[in-house]
Amino acid sequence: MHRFLSKKKIQHHIYVLNQVDHFRFNRAALINAGFLESSNSTDYIAMHDVDLLPLNEELDYGFPEAGPFHVASPELHPLYHYKTYVGGILLLSKQHYQLCNGMSNRFWGWGREDDEFYRRIKGAGLQLFRPSGITTGYKTFRHLHDPAWRKRDQKRIAAQKQEQFKIDREGGLSTVKYSVDSRTTLSVGGAPCTVLNIMLDCDKAATPWCTFG
């Protein structure tokens, strides 16, 4: 990514958000925490899955001034093709992310947080933009995800099956609870990088599916 962004002359700082607590994976809460911990010198964020790498240099990673820019659009993502999909790689100005109150913290386990975030984007009155003129189709990205790695995070437990389709109108960036266990700043192949080991907090009365078993 560093070579890719540097070639496009995009200044960047990579934040690796590593969940080190004993709860199930919560991508949205990690992104909320990463947003709060990121430097004030940044103008926008890239919510970028680590298992999705761009292969087409024509992809735009520039400042999404007009509104959220979904780099990994349904027409290009190798796996997810439904029209409301906004996962994988999404660029937002910090102002727009705050306008949405970030992402819902209720999604423990894999998936569905992006679908809820799509509704937040629309509810905030923002227009979603996607790439145009990209001719590489489903070969635009390299996708390294293997669901067998984290089987416990694929499960839908108890009321989670119903909750996953609801809109969280109260929680988000303003309510995420976490602590930073450690912070390491380093350079990887010349890329400026900060690794945050994050311990999330779970209200088990509200979301008992944060644990498994």
Feature locations, PLM:
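Active-site-proximal specificity loops/subdomain of glycosyltransferases
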Residues: 4-42, 76-78
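Structured beta-strand/turn binding interfaces of compact recognition modules in eukaryotic regulators
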Residues: 15-20, 48-51, 74, 93-95, ...
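Acidic, Ser/Thr-rich intrinsically disordered and amphipathic helical segments
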Residues: 29-33, 91, 116
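Conserved donor-nucleotide/metal-binding helix-loop-beta segment in metal-dependent transferases, i.e.
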Residues: 55-79
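C-terminal catalytic/acceptor-binding lobe
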Residues: 106-109, 115-213
